[in-house]
Amino acid sequence: MFNGIIYNSGSVEKISTSKNSSEIILKTNLIFKKSELGSSLNCNGTCLTITKINKNLISFYLSKETLSKTNFKFIKIGNIVNIEKSLSYGNKISGHYVQGHVDTCASVSAIKVLDKTWIISFLLKKIFQKNLIEKGSIAINGVSLTISRIKKNIFEVN
């Protein structure tokens, strides 16, 4: 469980792909102890299990299902990934509870800048619209945001 407040990121160092899965290696400035092997990490909103730790490099296994539903299908070496360690008892919750169970990807359809506010519109398949509520929470690339408006197959955050 995460809260969607992202303070850290990692860069994609290596991607190994097979027919049904991939392994990704991220370089990060976060410190991971060997005891955190097997722990969950919010990576761009997807709950992934740490499979290897080597100093500042961490590895993850991505199943065919994960690749089909997340933006990891588009990831390339050098890309930056939002990362957040899982919540611990007593942690402050500033965003909303983020489980990291991703249903689909949306695409940016428009960005409007009004004074100091950005309104970002996303195009979403109609089948997933039923899961959205105006003023409800959504995690986009792991970041906790509030849905400001829903219309047809588009939703907005700002």
Predicted regions and their residues:
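Conserved loop->alpha-helix
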Residues: 1-158
